[in-house]
Amino acid sequence: MYKRQDVYLPCATQNELDLDGVKTLIANGCKYIVEGANMPTTREATDYAMANGVLFLPGKASNAGGVATSALEMSQNSQRLSWTSEEVDAKLHQIMVDIYAKISDAAKRYDMPDNFVVGANIAGFEKVVDAMMAQGIV
C-alpha cells in the first residue's frame, strides 16, 4: 500500500490514513494527499502531513465533484434538458476550478497560502454566511 508515490488518494473509509501511514508515505516521497472520500485521513495525519510540506486537499473540496454532478443531474431533470457527457464534464470541470480558486484565495487572504484545509473551511463558512444574508436570516 505504501510504495514510492508522489500522490496518495485515500478514497475508502473514514480514518483509513492514520499518523503511522502518513509517516510512511512521506518517507516514501509522497508530496500530495488528495482526499476522495469523507474524512479518510485522521486529524493527526493531516496535521503531520501539512507540517512536513505535503500539499493536502481535504475531501470537502476535492471530493465535491460527486455532489456537484448530482446537482447537475437534478438541474437537467427539472428543466427537462439532456446534456452530453462532454457538456456535463465541462460544467463539472468549471465547478472544480471555481472551488480550487475559492479555497486558494481564502487561504491566501488569511496568510496561509497552500493551506487548503484552512481555505476550504473559510470558503465554506463564507458561502453559508452569504446564503444566510441573502435569505435575511442574518
Role assignments for model-derived ranges:
Residues 1-8:
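Conserved small/polar residues in nucleotide/adenosyl-binding loops
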Residues 3, 19-20, 125, 131:
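Aromatic-enriched hydrophobic runs in primary sequence
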Residues 9-11, 36:
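Short, well-ordered coil/turn residues at beta-beta hairpins
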Residues 12-21, 40-42:
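Beta-loop-alpha module in the N-terminal Rossmann-like domain of NAD(P)-dependent dehydrogenases
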Residues 26-138:
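Adenosine-phosphate binding glycine-rich loop
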